[in-house]
């Protein structure tokens, strides 16, 4: 019995979504990794289609974390601000290169008094989205601490990082250009991919989350292929080891009959 919701038609990815800015991207490839494409075509993705990948969204109070998630998951925008208490999450189902894939988006509180509660949910993230307000330079400066807190509970070498500027609709072109310059530098220092979005208008929101889903999926498949490759190598070593032992055992046996 399949208890998972079916994949919506607008959540199907047949190609790799492109980055916003090449100078601050996790990678600039135009297509999925060839090994990933091949594995999907041959249905060698292991347990990837059954896993739920955890994505945490962190950042200062009122930078627009909840609005960002709601715009993508529910296609809504609520102008009446309500602070997140503790944590909340949404589940999104995708189909990437014909393989089902699920993201669990964790919306964490930005208030200091809930920080301790929220941080307990950071562990096990495969992607971290650090959100700041494009109209508030202090919120950009604070992203470094938010990232440091999140990485205390995760392996920095195995998590994907995204730096997202929100409320782009409130910036003039001149204001945005200045903030983007600083944000790109921060993203490069973090080794994060940079995006700028507007939850009010929906600008870049869909493209951003598709990019998150695609890169997280790609990382999962590559990890699965590495595991399966290691298992195959291990099996060969064990077989060869057993063969050697059998040979040594046989050579030590005395003949049971006379020549």
Swiss-Prot record:
<protein>
    <recommendedName>
        <fullName>Ras-related protein Rab-34</fullName>
        <ecNumber>3.6.5.2</ecNumber>
    </recommendedName>
</protein>
<keyword id="KW-0206">Cytoskeleton</keyword>
<keyword id="KW-0813">Transport</keyword>
<keyword id="KW-0966">Cell projection</keyword>
<dbReference type="GO" id="GO:0090385">
    <property type="term" value="P:phagosome-lysosome fusion"/>
</dbReference>
<feature type="binding site">
    <location>
        <position position="84"/>
    </location>
    <ligand>
        <name>Mg(2+)</name>
    </ligand>
</feature>
<dbReference type="GO" id="GO:0030742">
    <property type="term" value="F:GTP-dependent protein binding"/>
</dbReference>
<keyword id="KW-0225">Disease variant</keyword>
<keyword id="KW-0449">Lipoprotein</keyword>
<comment type="function">
    <text>The small GTPases Rab are key regulators of intracellular membrane trafficking, from the formation of transport vesicles to their fusion with membranes. Rabs cycle between an inactive GDP-bound form and an active GTP-bound form that is able to recruit to membranes different sets of downstream effectors directly responsible for vesicle formation, movement, tethering and fusion. RAB34 transports protein involved in the redistribution of lysosomes to the peri-Golgi region. Plays a role in the maturation of phagosomes that engulf pathogens, such as S.aureus and M.tuberculosis.</text>
</comment>
<keyword id="KW-0597">Phosphoprotein</keyword>
<comment type="similarity">
    <text>Belongs to the small GTPase superfamily. Rab family.</text>
</comment>
<dbReference type="GO" id="GO:0045880">
    <property type="term" value="P:positive regulation of smoothened signaling pathway"/>
</dbReference>
<dbReference type="GO" id="GO:0090382">
    <property type="term" value="P:phagosome maturation"/>
</dbReference>
<keyword id="KW-0636">Prenylation</keyword>
<feature type="binding site">
    <location>
        <position position="63"/>
    </location>
    <ligand>
        <name>GTP</name>
    </ligand>
</feature>
<keyword id="KW-0333">Golgi apparatus</keyword>
<keyword id="KW-0653">Protein transport</keyword>
<feature type="short sequence motif" description="Switch 2">
    <location>
        <begin position="108"/>
        <end position="127"/>
    </location>
</feature>
<feature type="binding site">
    <location>
        <position position="65"/>
    </location>
    <ligand>
        <name>GTP</name>
    </ligand>
</feature>
<dbReference type="Pfam" id="PF00071">
    <property type="entry name" value="Ras"/>
</dbReference>
<dbReference type="InterPro" id="IPR050227">
    <property type="entry name" value="Rab"/>
</dbReference>
<keyword id="KW-0342">GTP-binding</keyword>
<feature type="modified residue" description="Phosphoserine">
    <location>
        <position position="244"/>
    </location>
</feature>
<dbReference type="GO" id="GO:0005929">
    <property type="term" value="C:cilium"/>
</dbReference>
<feature type="binding site">
    <location>
        <position position="167"/>
    </location>
    <ligand>
        <name>GTP</name>
    </ligand>
</feature>
<dbReference type="GO" id="GO:0005814">
    <property type="term" value="C:centriole"/>
</dbReference>
<feature type="binding site">
    <location>
        <position position="66"/>
    </location>
    <ligand>
        <name>GTP</name>
    </ligand>
</feature>
<dbReference type="GO" id="GO:0003924">
    <property type="term" value="F:GTPase activity"/>
</dbReference>
<feature type="binding site">
    <location>
        <position position="64"/>
    </location>
    <ligand>
        <name>GTP</name>
    </ligand>
</feature>
<dbReference type="GO" id="GO:0045335">
    <property type="term" value="C:phagocytic vesicle"/>
</dbReference>
<feature type="binding site">
    <location>
        <position position="66"/>
    </location>
    <ligand>
        <name>Mg(2+)</name>
    </ligand>
</feature>
<keyword id="KW-0968">Cytoplasmic vesicle</keyword>
<dbReference type="GO" id="GO:0005813">
    <property type="term" value="C:centrosome"/>
</dbReference>
<dbReference type="GO" id="GO:0048471">
    <property type="term" value="C:perinuclear region of cytoplasm"/>
</dbReference>
<keyword id="KW-0479">Metal-binding</keyword>
<dbReference type="GO" id="GO:0070062">
    <property type="term" value="C:extracellular exosome"/>
</dbReference>
<dbReference type="GO" id="GO:0005525">
    <property type="term" value="F:GTP binding"/>
</dbReference>
<keyword id="KW-0547">Nucleotide-binding</keyword>
<keyword id="KW-0472">Membrane</keyword>
<feature type="binding site">
    <location>
        <position position="78"/>
    </location>
    <ligand>
        <name>GTP</name>
    </ligand>
</feature>
<keyword id="KW-0970">Cilium biogenesis/degradation</keyword>
């Amino acid at each position: 019995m399949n208890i998972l919701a079916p994949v919506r038609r607008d959540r199907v990815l047949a190609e790799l979504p492109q980055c916003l800015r090449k100078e601050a991207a996790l990678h600039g490839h135009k297509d999925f990794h060839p090994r990933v494409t091949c594995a999907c075509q041959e249905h060698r993705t292991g347990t990837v289609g059954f896993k739920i990948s955890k994505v945490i969204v962190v950042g200062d109070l009122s930078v627009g974390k909840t609005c960002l998630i709601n715009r993508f998951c529910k296609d809504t925008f609520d102008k009446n601000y309500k602070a997140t208490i503790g944590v909340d999450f949404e589940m999104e189902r995708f189909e990437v290169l014909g393989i089902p894939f699920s993201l669990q988006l964790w919306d964490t509180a930005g208030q200091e008094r809930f920080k301790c509660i929220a941080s307990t949910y950071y562990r096990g993230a495969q992607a971290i989205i650090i959100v700041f307000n494009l109209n508030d330079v202090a919120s950009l400066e604070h992203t470094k601490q938010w990232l440091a807190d999140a990485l205390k509970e995760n392996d920095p070498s195995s998590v994907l990082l995204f730096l997202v500027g929100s409320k782009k609709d409130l910036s003039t072109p001149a204001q945005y250009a200045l903030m983007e310059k600083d944000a790109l530098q921060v993203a490069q220092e973090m080794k994060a991919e940079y995006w700028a979005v507007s939850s009010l208008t929906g600008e870049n929101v869909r493209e951003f989350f598709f990019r998150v889903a695609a890169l997280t999926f790609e990382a999962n498949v590559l990890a699965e292929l590495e595991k399966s490759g290691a298992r195959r190598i291990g099996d060969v070593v064990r077989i060869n080891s057993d063969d050697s032992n059998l040979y040594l055992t046989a050579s030590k046996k005395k003949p049971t009959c006379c020549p």
